[in-house]
A protein has these predicted regions:
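OB-fold and OB-like single-stranded nucleic-acid-recognition modules
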Residues: 18-120
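Sec-dependent N-terminal signal peptides
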Residues: 4-14
């Protein structure tokens, strides 16, 4: 019985992992609402410590204001990072996994933990 439960658990876990579709930056707007993986360079970022929600914003794919994707890290998620994300990820190639949403018609991925951003 335990062996069967273990096998079912492994199958479910692999289905979740493979459920993330890797897409190109040019395809972001076609996948709003989807959970995807996007690989690109981080060109910079900022910690808005005086803003109401104190987010950290990473510019993916180009410099601000031309970045085709913004990676948003909220204050609770930021505390889980070992280093300042806006410093650590700058000029690095990364793969970010998460759900694409739009903010003012611009694609973004909200990150809830450090494991969603992997340095290549």
């Amino acid at each position: 019985m335990k062996k069967g439960l273990f096998i079912v658990s492994i199958l479910l876990l692999s289905a979740v992992v493979h459920g993330q579709q890797e897409i190109k930056l040019e395809e972001l707007t076609k996948h709003v609402g989807d959970s995807v993986t996007v690989c690109t360079k981080i060109y910079g970022g900022i910690f808005l410590d005086r803003s109401k929600d104190t987010p950290t914003l990473l510019n993916a794919g180009d410099k601000y204001p031309n970045a085709p994707l913004t990676i948003v890290i909220g204050p609770d998620a930021r505390q889980k990072f070992k280093e300042k994300p806006e410093v650590f990820y700058k000029d690095k190639e990364v793969c970010v996994t998460g759900k694409i949403s739009l903010y003012k018609d611009k694609p973004q991925i909200v990150v809830y933990n450090e494991q969603q951003i992997v340095v290549k």
